[in-house]
Amino acid sequence: MDDMVSTEKDVFEPSLPDISSDTFKESNEKIAELSKKGYQLLKESEFDKAREAFFQILDIEDNNNYALVGLGDTSRKENKFNEAITFYNKCLSFYPSNNYALFGLADCYKALNQFSKAIDIWQQYLVHDDKNITVITRVADAYRKIHEFKKSKELYLKVLEMEKDNPYALIGLGHLSYDFKEYKDALGYWTRIYDLNLDNVDIRVLTAIGNCHRKLKTFEKGTFFFEKALERDPKNFYALFGLADCYRGMNQQAKSIEYWNMILELDPKNKVILTRAGDAYRTIGNYDEAVKYYTKALEIDFDIYAAIGLALICKCQGKFEEAVDRFKNLIRNDPRNSRLYVDLAECYSLMNKKDEAIKLLEDYLRNDGKNIQIRNLLERLRK
């Protein structure tokens, strides 16, 4: 979500001087002409033609910086990052302070998830231009990616001192806060982006704000932002998921099911969503539908929540022996899952096998003596 706002103008494209035919020799005129042509073709995504123009420059002048940067930019825009790195490094071997080569090289390392290398290159860039907000935000983003959160936050705040309401800094601070579960702070940063852009805000800002409300359990407020996102993109997974989960949180299971099923129309083999839909059907007592969804999920791959759902249905339907067998099997595969012991103990209790329930919970507490839920249930059973 790092590019939530509209793509910024590429301010790092080399600006060519006006070259007069009276001032420069014919070869320089040709280089200037080919450079302008190459960058224009690059803007038009005519990559092969742009590359041809830049190579023609190298035929005239070996190691021309415009040509080498242009070839790097062409490869970078084609996502051929290692090839681009070769061109940028060659340029820097002759022109160590070339900002365009430094910026392109850093962006390549960023795209390859080599964030430490990207930071090193951007730091070299900042030696020549330490007020460049675009580069500073990129360094902050990279620090966030390598979990250098303190440095990242310092740089984002530095950007906001230089330019109030800089969208990239606000977005980055939102991510930092969200990652540290500081959802109110994240909501504040992302809401500021929304307030500044309103109807033109990127859809990812809308879903990010919605997700903050989900985490804060202010579900009704969350639905507003997820619905606005769906107005932009009716098939947006994050908006559909957010609405389904908000309605689940508001205990409006029928509405929740509506959105789970909309996701499944787009992605019918999503076992997580199949299980969520199964849970919703189980909650409203539609066990037949719930079984269908859980079974579909398990046919794709084992899902413990789907398996638990089937066991809970047996428990709710009074099929206690089957429920006990299911919970025992699950415990064998996941012996530290306290929820399974609670459900199994409740089954024993409903079967008038209170002693077995008590023994089960006592055995569990030998390994996890501080589990409050288990201790409370054990206390109730002993009364």
Where are these regions (language model features)?
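Canonical tetratricopeptide repeat
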Residues: K36, G70, G104, R138, ...
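Structural marker of alpha-solenoid helical repeat scaffolds
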Residues: I60, F94, H128-D129, M162, ...
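Helix-start (N-cap) detector for alpha-helical repeat units in TPR-like alpha-solenoids
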Residues: I31, N65-Y66, N99-Y100, I133-T134, ...
